[in-house]
């Protein structure tokens, strides 16, 4: 089935797997989803991810992260900001702080996908893809 919003699909799959306390979830592999997974791993929101499959059927297997004996998800919430029907852009001075810096905003810039902190440090803006906290 063709998906119009691969980022929204990725966030929904991670959110649903977290709620069901699954160890892993599979996501169709694109350059964008791969970059977002790299940012989530670097920021400590997911344990790891690996690419599987061949040709058109490639997908990412994302290992989710939990804390404590009751396995509370590290990711409390994921929110899609810029959608296919309404794109949201921000320059470096307008980049949002998520929960006062506790969470991250993932930004698509001319230098690639990065967090709001990295974009602010480099002094560049871009499309605000999503919030994670």
Swiss-Prot record:
SUPFAM superfamilies per UniProt: Ribosomal protein S8 (SSF56047)
A GO term, aspect molecular function: structural constituent of ribosome
Residues in coiled coil: none
Entries under Pfam families matching the protein: Ribosomal_S8
Keywords recorded for this protein, A-Z: Ribonucleoprotein, Ribosomal protein, RNA-binding, rRNA-binding
GO biological process terms on file: translation
Family: Belongs to the universal ribosomal protein uS8 family.
Subunit structure: Part of the 30S ribosomal subunit. Contacts proteins S5 and S12.
Task performed by this protein: One of the primary rRNA binding proteins, it binds directly to 16S rRNA central domain where it helps coordinate assembly of the platform of the 30S subunit.
Identification of the protein by name: Small ribosomal subunit protein uS8
Protein species of origin: Thermosynechococcus vestitus (strain NIES-2133 / IAM M-273 / BP-1)
């Amino acid at each position: 089935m063709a998906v119009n919003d691969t980022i929204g699909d990725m966030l929904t799959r991670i959110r649903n797997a977290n709620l069901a306390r699954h160890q892993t979830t599979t996501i169709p592999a694109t350059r964008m989803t791969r970059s977002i997974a790299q940012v989530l791993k670097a920021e400590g929101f997911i344990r790891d991810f690996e690419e599987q499959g061949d040709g058109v059927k490639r997908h990412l297997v994302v290992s989710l992260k939990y804390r404590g004996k009751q396995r509370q998800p590290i990711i409390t919430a994921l929110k899609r900001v810029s959608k296919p029907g309404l794109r949201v852009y921000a320059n470096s001075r307008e980049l949002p702080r998520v929960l006062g810096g506790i969470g991250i905003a993932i930004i698509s810039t001319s230098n690639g996908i990065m967090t709001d902190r990295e974009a602010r440090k480099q002094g560049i803006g871009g499309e605000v893809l999503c919030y994670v906290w």
